[in-house]
Regions:
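Generic helix N-cap/helix-start motif at coil->alpha-helix transitions
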Residues: 3-10, 39-44, 74-75
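Conserved small-residue packing positions in alpha-helical repeats and bundles
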Residues: 8-15, 48, 65
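Helix-turn-helix repeat elements of alpha-solenoid scaffolds
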Residues: 19-29
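Alpha-helical solenoid scaffolds that mediate protein-protein interactions
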Residues: 27, 31-34, 67
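Boundary/linker segments of alpha-helical solenoid repeat arrays
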Residues: 19, 42-43, 72-79, 90
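TPR/TPR-like (Sel1-like) alpha-helical repeat modules
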Residues: 61-71
Length: 91
């Protein structure tokens, strides 16, 4: 497990336990901005999860389209779900 994923899991846990209180949301936005600056593939993969958690469905879908492995069934399924959300919700 990489450092980005560890940090995401911790922030996600805080977000869910506090039911999205402002401090946990701010921490996620700060982490999102940090990941957006990184060129690391692992950071981009975690960024998809952060976008999804923060309801940036369109951004999550577009990023996963760019970096996702289309031969992986799990990725294809997630792309389908995110595409539906992106079309109906946007960001």
């Amino acid at each position: 497990m990489n450092e980005y994923l560890k940090q995401y899991i911790e922030l996600q846990k805080q977000f869910r336990e506090t039911e999205g209180n402002p401090d946990s949301v701010r921490a996620l936005y700060t982490f999102k901005e940090e990941l957006e600056q990184s060129e690391d593939q692992q950071a981009k993969e975690v960024l998809v999860d952060v976008y999804d958690l923060l309801d940036f469905k369109k951004d999550a879908y577009e990023l996963l389209c760019q970096i996702g492995n289309r031969s992986d069934k799990k990725t294809l399924k997630r792309l389908g779900v995110l595409k539906d959300y992106a079309e109906n919700w946007g960001n």
